[in-house]
Amino acid sequence: MIILSGIELTVFLKGYLHVSKISGENDELYILNHLGEYGLMLDQIHDRLNAVSKMYPIDAVEITSKGFRHSEYEIPEINYPKIASDDLHAIVGIGRAWIEVNVITRTKDAIIKAVRQGDFWNGYI
């Protein structure tokens, strides 16, 4: 198991949004976090993604909230890889959701590349 660490950035853009910045060896991954917590309609999600993408190169969106799945965001109209995460807000949520990748080189940068390409699968408890 490889755990990638990062920081959650708070972005104030038409309300607040969270973006994870995950560091690899030489690369970084940016994820718009927990879509289910914002109460946004699809057109508003697209609007926020366009706005945030001007600040950070968004690579994926998180379709979980504190480890709980929000399948309503697993739609092709959101044209980003959709990632599951437990988001580690409380001990009860640790390990509830994760991603798995099958990479030849087991490096953080290889994992980041796989996520960008959507070459992973989500796991849930």
Where are the regions a protein language model picked out?
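Acidic beta-strand-to-loop metal/phosphate-binding motif
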Residues: 31-35
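Charged catalytic cores and adjacent phosphate/nucleic-acid-binding surfaces used
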Residues: 1-5, 11-27, 37-125
